[in-house]
Every structure is written in C-alpha cells, then in structure tokens.
Design a protein with these regions (language model features):
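Metal-dependent polysaccharide deacetylase catalytic core of the NodB/CE4 family, i.e.
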Residues: 33-36, 55-151, 180-183
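Short active-site loop/helix that positions an aromatic residue
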Residues: 49, 53-55
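C-terminal active-site subregion of NodB/CE4 polysaccharide deacetylases
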Residues: 1-39, 44-49, 115-230
Length: 230
C-alpha cells in the first residue's frame, strides 16, 4: 500500500471524527470507540518514511515484526519472487522506536501458529519476543498472530511467554476463542477503495467480514511456501 493511500486513510478517519491513539504503552481498556489504533504487520523497509511521518502527526504506530526476516527479503511471501521486499533492519527498528513507534512480535518464521504445539510453538512466541527486546532495549508484550490464526492453546502459550495481548482479525473469532486476550482489527488492503474503507469503518457488516476472511484464506499460498522453506 502506497504512503499516500495510508495518509488518505488517516484523513478519512479524521473526517469521520475519529482520533488516533498515542502513547508508549498500549492499554486497550483506555482506548475509546472513537479512537483508532494504527498497526502494521510485517514491518517492511519501505514503511519507514511513512511510520516516521505518522509519529510526527502525533500518531503511535504499532509494527509487528517476524524476527527471522529482520533486515532480510520477504521469502515467506509466495509473491516475493515477483514483488520482492525487504523488512526493517535492527538499526531501523531502533530509530523508529526512538521516534515513538511500538514494536511487537509477529512470530519468528511468520508461519501460522494454529497448527503448532510444544517446543516449536514456544520458539515462535518466546524467541521472537526475546530477540526483539534485545534489539530495541524495551519490553515487547504484544503479538500479532500470523494470518490472524490461533487456538486456545496458542493463547495460553502466548500468555505464559509474557504477552499481555494478541491481535488477530475477525471480531467473531476473537470473541469466541480469545477470552479478552485476543483483540480484533479492521484489515485494510491495497485493493480497498474509498467506499469499501468507509463501509469497513462505519458499518463493518457481513460482506466486509466475508471479504476479510476470503483474503485471509488466500494467504494459503504464503503458508504453503513457508512450509517448504521450513
């Protein structure tokens, strides 16, 4: 998604009377219904100028990083051979944190966690948290589940590793299986236009939720590629 598109989304939110969350410690209970929390999964390098600009506008972005790809190309993504992109480096993350960006975990390998158990699951949760904390010198207590997929066992393991909250996508799935630990988000994609964005933000009904689920299922190409890489 191009920076001007994201900035246009910010303008749309302002036009709808929505303010933006700002702070150095995310507490969802203190966020009102008319406040938007801006999050970015994957932490691509080309997001850096945009993230810095959002900070200058008194917006605190939260960026979720897959630690195996820090400073590396997005080999986990099935389209990476056609559209290669590099993730933020450790130094870039440090500079962004100094500007006000919050860094969260997106696992180690970016693989879906819902099929993992035991040592492998703990590695994704614990090791990513520990590595990010070592890089930025701050506590990392938020995780965005890759592809928005989770199970009660994943939630239990995440909490035992010290995460305060996990972020996923579908509100119904978060309510049913999250127990208040998993927070839903409104996904925004490059294909979204003005009217679909407005519909998502003002009347997030069945059609928009269905679109989100379909796009989530289309992530299967990336999941298959990840399995091949791992």
């Amino acid at each position: 998604m191009k920076p001007r598109t994201v900035l246009g989304i910010m303008d749309l939110l302002r036009d709808l009377g929505i303010s933006f969350w700002r702070g150095d410690h995310f507490e969802p209970d203190r966020v009102t219904k008319r406040t938007a929390v801006i999050t970015f999964d994957d932490g691509y390098q080309d997001n850096y100028p945009l993230l810095a600009r959002l900070c200058s506008q008194h917006i605190t972005p939260i960026v979720f990083m897959p630690t195996a790809y820090v400073g590396r190309q997005n080999a986990w993504e099935y389209s990476s051979r056609v559209f290669p992109a590099r993730h933020l480096s450790a130094d870039e993350m440090k500079r962004l944190v100094d500007l006000g960006v919050i860094i969260g975990s997106h696992g180690v390998s970016h693989m879906s966690l819902d099929g993992m158990t035991g040592v492998r699951l703990r590695r994704e949760l614990h090791d990513s948290k520990a590595e990010l904390e070592q890089i930025i010198g701050r506590t990392v207590d938020l995780i965005s589940y890759p592809f928005g997929r989770f199970t009660p066992a994943v939630n239990e393991a995440a909490q035992s590793c010290g995460y305060r909250h996990a972020l996923a996508l579908d509100p119904e799935e978060c309510r049913a299986g999250g127990g208040g630990f998993v927070l839903p988000r409104i996904p925004i994609y490059a294909a979204d236009g003005y009217f679909s964005l407005k519909a998502k933000l003002t009347h997030p009904g069945r059609i928009e939720r269905l679109k989100g689920r379909i796009i989530g299922r289309l992530a299967g190409g990336s999941i298959i590629r990840l399995r091949a890489l791992n």
